[in-house]
Amino acid sequence: AATKQMNALVDEKYINDKDVVNLLENKLVLITGKQTTTEVKDFSDIAKAETIAIGDPEVVPAGQYAKMALTHLGLYDALTSKYSLGGNVTEVLNWVASSSSEVGIVYSTDAKSSKDVKVLAKCDNSLLDEPVIYPVAKLAKTKHSDETEKFMKFIQKKSSLKQFENYGFTVNK
């Protein structure tokens, strides 16, 4: 999920704007470990948690979205002492799964990949400045234009999109 990064590539002329396809959408979710007891039920009462795992907003797109949602709720700055900042979503997921953190914020698809966490709540898109979109594009200058075109067509085929849906993504139409 990196529309900001894709836009930067367009701005730097590495990618032509007309070639960008917003292929998939994901959701941000609040999770806890299956064996963890928590009073937290929703994003709005996340302050009840002792520890909160999120991706580092400086480098992890999921962390940027988590910060956005918590900022919209007026909670981000007030909770800084409770954060464990992960270097990636998998690290956050593992902390929550092992009960090292009481709750965490990850993508829905990541939560779905673990048997050791449960989803407490989905983040309403109104808490985000933009939805969690996965854009794809070919490079403006590539020696492998034919292969790139074939790949772009392949990932947009009905059968490919069905596989993405099986993993919890929503096809962005």
Question: How would you name each of these model-derived features?
Answer:
Residues A2-K13, D19-L24, V29-K173:
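Exported/periplasmic ABC-transporter solute-binding proteins
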